[in-house]
Amino acid sequence: PPPTVTPATPVAAVAPAQAAEVWQLAPAVHLYPDASGPASGGPWLILLESTHPTTPLAGAVGDLLDKMLRALGLHQHPQVWLAVLQRPGGLPMAAEMAGSLAPVDWQPLPAQLAHTLQTVQPARVLLLGQKVAQTVLERHEPVGQLRQQRFDLAGHAAAVSYDPSFLLRTSQPKKYKAQTWADLQFAAQLPARSK
């Protein structure tokens, strides 16, 4: 008799990735875990959009961000954290695109931000980028009007500046990089807790 062929077990179809309906936040990443300098001024939390939520210092944007933070001496600070936001309508990023073998645990922004603030206990929060600043602070002004001001974010002092990706594509990089440097210095001078 001819050999019998057992039909292959059907493979469950993988559901297509669903677009996010609300702003989402990835877990905070410890930027400089090997830093051995003093934690002067307390922990930092940086919020921005990035195509590398688990490795935010990757790529040209990450390289510029790293240079900005190093200029401020934060590469020696043991408590610098960064969390990436994703806009509504964005598809969840595949792990390999995120520079990690682990999936990105995107969570709705309000709950994840509250959890991140509670966990990190930042002395200051730096909001980079117009949409990030407007969404987190629930404001409508452009970055140019929000920068060089102190905001309260659930009891934590917060400051706003330009996103590194904007600095790479603007036609006036010197102007905006100088303003961003001033904003970083402003953020570094913020008291640990917002009044």
Predicted segments, located by residue:
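A polyanion-binding, active-site-adjacent surface
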Residues: 1-195
